């Protein structure tokens, strides 16, 4: 049987980090087994579902490279199908109409709570065989078995069993003809021929109800795998503040999609002590039943380390487009400065994110705005002008503006003046960047460009003379 998995987000918000991990695990399991990965948009919550959220989910999936093998399925386009299946269950005596008012249902709930019981529907309409009537309270309820147990072998959690006596007759169709979650997902997974249902363990309590529906419909039962939740770094439930952000906010913060994928897969799964995987290695090695049943903890330091690894090792040509995007987000005209690939080579060892790289790269694309006064006091003081003037003369006369030529000019300055290279590099570094810290001084000057470098040296000389 062909493996078919699905990711089924509700478009009531963005794709968060937990949803992205679920999508990744579904995608990997399907790819490893040469199966199909499908996307279903569970958009029946008409008050909260939005097209903007749908677009955001699709955009995030595309950014992560989680491609799906068939067009997305939208639940709102399948309302007729849900009604057909509900009608079949009615005709077979496996479901029934109920017309209980909200007050009646609230009274049932309060009575159960007073006696310390679990709130549940009391089945008042189960045997009444009530006919259809136009009523705002009309629902269709599924006749859950009263006896026996529901058991299944979860690929992650192991054997799970529950008595049917703990389950009530759930609503499957609302008065407006829209399905409830538990009903819709069973019909969808059946129609989509899903063989493995991989989802968060917040759905584990729904599974026995769904299994009974599968049996009532005579539908083949998929295999279930319920993923443990992701906790924040303190071991608490994730919030927007502690990491449960829109996946695209990770992009905006400067993380690479393949770095995030590499990090996410390790939040619950491992292959020995190996930390870094390319995509094909993940496809070859990942197995859903190897996922740990315990909750994973977010570790932003580890994500930064993984991201920096790829910044250091990826081809600069592949890193250039996302770096340009980050520079443009800062209002920078990239055509006014050095090639992005050169910037990447200069900064890749010094940063963990593309956002940080773009911030540091501003010195090569924008006029120098300010000086670090501590750096000025230490390095742009009387006497420093000698090295700056000598370096300026050689830089202005270079036949070609290359890193090697710039480096030669600076070293020649140190040799000619019989001073250490630091006496040349540090005043020049402050003159060019306004700070005491930068990449290799020759590369820093080269990326600034001849005209801008000379202009900044002149400004530093004026600053020294007026100190």
UniProtKB/Swiss-Prot annotation:
Enzyme class: ligase
EC number annotated for this UniProt entry: 6.1.1.17
Reactions mediated catalytically: tRNA(Glu) + L-glutamate + ATP = L-glutamyl-tRNA(Glu) + AMP + diphosphate
Highest taxon of source: Bacteria
UniProt short sequence motif 'KMSKS' region, positions renumbered to this chain: 237-241
Keyword field: Aminoacyl-tRNA synthetase, ATP-binding, Cytoplasm, Ligase, Nucleotide-binding, Protein biosynthesis
Chain span(s) of sequence motif 'HIGH' region: 9-19
Residues the record lists as binding ATP: 240
Cystines in this chain: none
InterPro entries the record matches: aa-tRNA-synth_I_cd-bd, aa-tRNA-synth_I_codon-bd_sub2, aa-tRNA-synth_I_CS, aa_tRNA-synth_I_cd-bd_sf, Glu-tRNA-ligase_bac/mito, Glu/Gln-tRNA-synth, Glu/Gln-tRNA-synth_Ib_cat-dom, GluQ/Sye
Localization (cell): Cytoplasm
Protein task: Catalyzes the attachment of glutamate to tRNA(Glu) in a two-step reaction: glutamate is first activated by ATP to form Glu-AMP and then transferred to the acceptor end of tRNA(Glu).
Family from the record: Belongs to the class-I aminoacyl-tRNA synthetase family. Glutamate--tRNA ligase type 1 subfamily.
Subunit structure: Monomer.
Protein name: Glutamate--tRNA ligase
Organism: Xylella fastidiosa (strain Temecula1 / ATCC 700964)
């Amino acid at each position: 049987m062909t493996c078919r998995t699905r990711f089924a987000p509700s478009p009531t918000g963005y794709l968060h980090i937990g949803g992205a991990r679920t999508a990744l695990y579904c995608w990997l399991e399907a790819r490893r087994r040469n199966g199909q990965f499908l996307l279903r948009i569970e958009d029946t919550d008409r008050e909260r579902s939005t097209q903007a959220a749908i677009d955001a989910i699709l955009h995030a999936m595309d950014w992560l490279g989680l491609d799906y093998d068939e067009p997305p399925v939208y639940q709102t386009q399948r309302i007729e199908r849900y009604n057909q299946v509900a009608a079949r269950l009615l005709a077979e005596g496996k479901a029934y109409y109920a017309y209980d008012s909200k007050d009646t249902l609230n009274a049932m709930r309060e009575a159960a709570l007073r006696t310390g019981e679990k709130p549940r529907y009391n089945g008042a309409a189960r045997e009444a065989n009530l006919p259809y009537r136009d009523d705002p309270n009309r629902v269709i309820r599924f006749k859950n078995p009263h006896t026996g147990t529901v058991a299944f072998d979860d690929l992650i959690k192991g054997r799970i069993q529950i008595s049917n006596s703990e389950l009530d007759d759930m609503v499957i169709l609302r008065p407006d003809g829209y399905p409830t979650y538990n009903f819709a997902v069973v019909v969808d997974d059946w129609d989509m021929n899903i063989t493995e249902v991989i989802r968060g363990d917040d759905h584990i309590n729904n599974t026995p109800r769904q299994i009974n529906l599968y049996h009532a419909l005579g539908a083949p039962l998929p295999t279930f795998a319920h993923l443990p939740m992701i906790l924040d770094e303190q071991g608490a439930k994730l919030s927007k503040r502690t990491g449960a952000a829109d996946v695209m906010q990770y992009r905006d913060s400067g993380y690479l999609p393949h770095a995030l994928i590499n990090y996410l897969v390790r939040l619950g799964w491992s292959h020995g002590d190996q930390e870094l995987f390319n995509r094909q290695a993940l496809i070859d090695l990942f197995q859903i039943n190897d996922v740990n049943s315990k909750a994973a903890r977010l570790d932003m330091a580890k994500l930064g380390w993984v991201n920096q690894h790829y910044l250091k090792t990826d081809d600069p040509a592949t890193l250039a487009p996302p770096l340009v995007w980050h520079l443009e987000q800062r209002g920078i005209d990239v055509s006014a400065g050095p090639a992005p690939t050169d910037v990447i080579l200069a900064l890749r060892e010094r940063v963990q994110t593309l956002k940080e790289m773009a911030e540091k790269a501003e010195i090569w694309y924008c006029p120098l705005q300010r000086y670090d006064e501590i750096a000025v006091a230490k390095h742009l003081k009387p006497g420093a002008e000698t090295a700056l003037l000598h370096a300026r003369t050689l830089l202005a006369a270079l036949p070609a503006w290359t890193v090697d030529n710039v480096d030669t000019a600076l070293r020649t300055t140190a040799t000619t003046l019989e001073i250490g290279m630091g006496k040349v590099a540090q005043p020049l570094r402050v003159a060019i960047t306004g700070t005491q810290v930068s990449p290799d001084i020759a590369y820093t000057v080269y990326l600034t460009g001849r005209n801008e470098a000379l202009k900044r040296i002149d400004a530093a000389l004026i600053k020294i003379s007026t100190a």
